[in-house]
Amino acid sequence: MLGQARLRSLIETVARTVIEHEDELTQLDSAIGDGDHGANMKRGFEAVLAELDALAAKPLPETLKAVGTQLVMKVGGASGPLYGTLFMSLGKSLPETLDRQSVAQALDAAIAAVRARGKAETGQKTMLDVLVPVQRALASGADPAAVAARANEAAEATIPMKATRGRASFLGERSIGHMDPGARSSALIVEAVASCFGIST
């Protein structure tokens, strides 16, 4: 079970990591999307930071559901509902007492929810191309550093992909050669979580 101080640190680290990478996410999205992913994600996680004390006072499952609600309300675009679904589903599936397998199982359920919401599969140049390999790494017993490394490798692996879902799919072949911004923001979140468990890349 995460104590209140550690839960607060976890939420804050994830939020600040995403906010600090606003420009990078904007640049990635400008190449193959609307160019608003960085600003949208920043707005969502600033709303999370504004509620930090209240969020950290809740049990972990309730915290994650509340974070998801904030992201749905504040992020907008395609990413808001997808990240909101991810966090809310994690909140529904995670027990209060964590171990690697329970996290892997909860992430698997959350991925299924994101897949249904976004009508996407792996290989289509989306956040799923990071989340699915991360879940597999967790399920295989990988430590936090290895999970974070896998997230970053998976985000890089979207560069040669042709987008077939989302705004980037309108570009067809021209989407090749660019990292998917949603994959990158997913990797940032995974890396931030991993760093809170004592190991960073």
Write out the residue ranges for each language-model feature.
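N-terminal loops that bind phosphate or other acidic moieties
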Residues: 1-201
